[in-house]
Amino acid sequence: MKNVYGNALTLTLFGESHGSSIGAVLDGLSPGIPVDEAHIARELTRRRPQGQTATARVEQDPFVIESGVFNGCTTGTPLCIRIPNAGQHSGDYAGMQDCARPGHSDYPAFCKYHGYSDYRGGGHFSGRITAALVAAGAIAEGALRGRGIRIGTHLAACAGVQDRPFRQTDGQIPDGELDALREPGFPVLDRAAGERMQQASLAAKADGGSVGGVTE
């Protein structure tokens, strides 16, 4: 039943979509790692739904670092970051506790927690929990940057449309490739492919359906 991930560095997720808050606890961070709260805020802004292909639930995601940081650096003790919830519409889910939605985690959550889980908005398995993942990832990303390591992901395929692969020089991906992914819109290397992905997604949405994707 645990919600703890990792070994040397562990991540614990807490909260539900329609609870008071969500958040994450990182344990195993070395002391003295700079924590850039402005960078965390920027990453949460990037995660925030944008455009017609995103969820209608939009929150500002103010966060509070409850522990593990002092004078702008990690202390080495567990770092807890909490994000209050504000945009819930629990009435939309009235009567749905006995009706599992296709493509959602409702049924697996029911089986795992024997019917006691908070089903509203997907509960602990809502897309809302990705805000906590992004916040924790921004902190871990800062630790990796100090070692010369960068992280980047692009939407390699969506709705049958392929993005081009990363360009590499001597086994390294140039910074420009990763920087391009931070531009507004779909995180793709080929903007024309991104436009086709978006159009295919909107067409599926208009038809009451959805599309899948592959990241790299």
Give residue spans per PLM region.
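Generic N-terminal targeting/processing segments that precede catalytic cores or assembly contacts
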Residues: M1-T130, V134-E216
